[in-house]
From Swiss-Prot:
Coiled-coil region: none
GO BP annotation list: ribosomal small subunit biogenesis
EC number(s) given by UniProt: 3.6.1.-
Pfam families: RsgA_GTPase
Protein name, UniProt field: Small ribosomal subunit biogenesis GTPase RsgA
InterPro entries xrefs: G_CP_dom, NA-bd_OB-fold, P-loop_NTPase, Ribosome_biogen_GTPase_RsgA, RsgA_GTPase_dom
Recorded GO CC terms: cytoplasm
UniProt organism field: Marinobacter nauticus (strain ATCC 700491 / DSM 11845 / VT8)
Keywords for the protein's UniProt record, in alphabetical order: Cytoplasm, GTP-binding, Hydrolase, Metal-binding, Nucleotide-binding, Ribosome biogenesis, RNA-binding, rRNA-binding, Zinc
Gene3D superfamilies (UniProt xref): Nucleic acid-binding proteins (2.40.50.140), P-loop containing nucleotide triphosphate hydrolases (3.40.50.300), Probable gtpase engc, domain 3 (1.10.40.50)
Required cofactor names: Zn(2+)
Length: 351
């Protein structure tokens, strides 16, 4: 469906609203700066980034009499990019505002390249990635493998969660079972659920995954990430979209990465849907490392410059012939490498 064109009045109104928001934000930031200059800010303390709105972030106080309260904070210009899940040092101001003065060291960082090749952080300090797939939209090995390569390169464990099990039928059952079996054979944890069948209550299998963990849900649009989160956090207002009947693709429903505290313990980060998880910022060697069954074969090819594309003496081809690498995973590996080559041919470089 083509995008609806806006008339001049609509464009003017949108620009006016954006300008007003910018002015309000600048006014608040100036007020906080004046408080800092006057010595009116509170003492430095630890906080947690629970939401990100451009230059403003929601920080939850982690200590002191205001522990658990949320403050809208501004970021000092000398601080690198912050993401949901970051732990920071901040100073409270008036009217639930504050200033972030430092970012604490990260345990890990999940990031991906944007359409221009620049790395964009997604979430920090997470215990595992929950990769949600579903019978509809149809799951594809290549997209799943992109997420798994990203998790392996970040040293963040990944769990594959099959949602919408109520949509499994005789037409797709064998394909889905074969797909899940491939990843279980590689040692990946696989869980199953159906948010539509839990009547709004959290499924025990999902609660077990997220309990006392900091989790981030990823997956293509339409697989039901927001629906699952809504069962875990029924009091939170999350917009839930349906799969488009015309395209079969999902509709993005989450626009801002947010961190939620779970009633049963643990935290959950819900980030905007990601349709394509590009890996062109990686080297071929890093992609090799991201495939668990290929990792032990690194450096075993006959020639050091082996491209793993049918070259003589390729250790990957030998492993595939021996059944140690599935045809689907090898095809996915080749496609990722080809995508990287295509991006380089287009002149895409990291900034």
């Amino acid at each position: 469906m083509a995008k609806r064109r806006l008339n001049k009045r609509q464009q003017w109104r949108i620009e006016k609203i954006q300008k007003e928001r910018t002015v309000r934000a600048a006014r608040k930031e100036k007020a906080v700066e004046e408080q800092a200059a006057a010595g009116e800010l509170g003492p430095e303390q630890n906080g947690l980034v629970i939401a990100h709105y451009g230059q403003q972030l929601d920080i939850e106080a982690l200590e002191g009499p205001e522990s658990g309260q949320v403050f809208r904070c501004f970021v000092r210009a000398n601080i690198d990019s912050l993401v949901t899940g970051d732990r920071v040092v901040w100073r409270p101001g008036k009217s639930k505002t504050g200033v972030i003065v430092a970012r604490c060291e990260r345990e890990n960082l999940l990031q991906r390249p944007d359409n221009f090749g620049a790395l964009k952080p997604v979430a920090a300090n997470i215990d595992h990635i929950i990769l949600v797939i579903a019978p509809e939209p149809e799951p594809h090995d290549n997209l799943i493998d992109r997420y798994l390569v990203a998790s392996e390169s970040s040293d963040i464990p990944a769990v594959i969660l099959l949602n919408k099990t109520d949509l499994i039928n005789d037409d797709n059952r064998d394909q889905i079972e074969a797909l899940l079996a491939r990843y279980q054979a590689l040692g990946y944890e696989v869980a199953r659920t159906s948010a539509a069948e839990t009547a709004g209550t959290p499924a025990p299998e999902v609660e077990a995954l997220v309990r006392n963990q900091t989790s981030v849900f990823v997956g293509q649009s339409g697989v039901g990430k927001s629906s699952i989160i809504q069962t875990l956090l029924p009091d939170e207002l999350l917009r839930v979209g349906a799969v488009s009947e015309s395209t079969g693709k999902g509709v993005h429903t989450t626009t801002t990465a947010k961190l939620f505290h779970l009633p049963g313990g643990g935290d959950l980060i819900d980030s905007p849907g990601i349709r394509e998880f590009g890996l062109w910022h990686m080297t071929p060697q890093e992609v090799e490392y991201g495939f668990r069954e290929i990792r032990p074969l690194i450096g075993l090819c006959k020639f050091r410059n082996c491209r793993h594309m049918g070259d003589p003496g390729c250790a990957l081809d030998a492993a595939a012939e021996a059944g140690d690498i599935s045809p689907e995973r090898l095809k996915s590996f080749h496609r990722i490498l080809q995508d990287m080559t295509d991006q380089q041919a287009r002149g895409l470089k990291l900034t």
